[in-house]
Amino acid sequence: MLTQTTGRSEAPSHPTMFARSVPPAPQTAYKGAPASDPLTQQIQLMGATMTFSRNAEIFGENEPADYLYKVISGAVRTYKILSDGRRQIGGFYLPGDVFGLEFADEHSLAAEAITDIKVRVIKRSALAALADRNAGTARELYALTACELRRAQARILLLVKSAQERVASFLLEMAERAAADNAIDLPMSRQDIADYLGLTIETVSRTLTALETAAAIDVPTSRRIVLRNRGALSRLNG
């Protein structure tokens, strides 16, 4: 089931979708694409609003990549289950972020709601046709593709770093994406962070404790991180 609140295009059906009310966004607001950019405007104008419950699958690995998604509220993870059963998280998408962009016709990763979420959905074919006619939309699609490529390259470099370097890099990345200066309310669990960084949850917890002991961060709750010494984190990040 789905909920379509506005938009001209027909909302896509999906067997794993659940229509429900979406709670307020987390305390930390996150930066996304400006509301005035051509791509965001077209997704808002032509897309359909859909909601997913926490942990619901949005799309599966190897499913047709027919739609592009923009996060309105909540958080999304993309992931792959490896042959040995381990989960590797490819990325986190927060309010304002666009996901589902693929270089092929199928999704290389699955996507799942971390929290109850609301997204704006547009058909990939409709957006591609618009980009053929609208230079602004074409530029934004190119910029989005380039951003995804940069993120992929950064992840390759991240996975050769030490545990402290990986965690420091992650915290700085989240702080950069957040509108808040130093306090970050993370929507993802420590297991999510571990699966993203290629570490165990125990290593993530020990590393956060070590960074707190070194006065680089405060950890008032399991999801709230306060950056006390960005310089120290930046030096770890290289």
List each model region and its residues:
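Cyclic nucleotide-binding regulatory module and flanking cytosolic helices
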Residues: M1-R54, D97-F99, A104
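Short loop/turn motifs at secondary-structure junctions and domain boundaries
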Residues: Q41-Q42, I58-N62, A178
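Cyclic nucleotide-binding regulatory domains
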Residues: A56-T115
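Short aromatic/basic micro-patch
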Residues: L68, F92, V121, P187, ...
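Cyclic-nucleotide recognition modules
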Residues: G91-R150
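Polybasic "coupling" helices that flank or enter modular domains
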Residues: D132-I201
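Phosphate-/nucleic-acid-contacting segments
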Residues: M174-G238
